[in-house]
Amino acid sequence: MSKRGRGGTSGAKFRISLGLPVGAVMNCADNTGAKNLFVIAVYGIKGR
């Protein structure tokens, strides 16, 4: 049983593309000292 319901919708389930994929490299723009950020996981996306 899933934690979140479908909201009563029926029909085809559309695939929502991710904003940032796993493995994306981003430039950091704050003063932490890091220059590049590497995405190692995307939270909340369940798939096969």
Swiss-Prot record:
Keywords: Ribonucleoprotein, Ribosomal protein
Leader sequence segment: none
GO molecular function: large ribosomal subunit rRNA binding; structural constituent of ribosome
Matches recorded under InterPro entries: Ribosomal_uL14 (IPR000218), Ribosomal_uL14_sf (IPR036853)
GO cellular component: cytosolic large ribosomal subunit
Transmembrane segments: none
UniProt-listed GO biological process terms: translation
UniProt family annotation: Belongs to the universal ribosomal protein uL14 family.
PANTHER family: 50S/60S RIBOSOMAL PROTEIN L14/L23, LARGE RIBOSOMAL SUBUNIT PROTEIN UL14
Name this polypeptide is given: Large ribosomal subunit protein uL14
Gene: RPL23
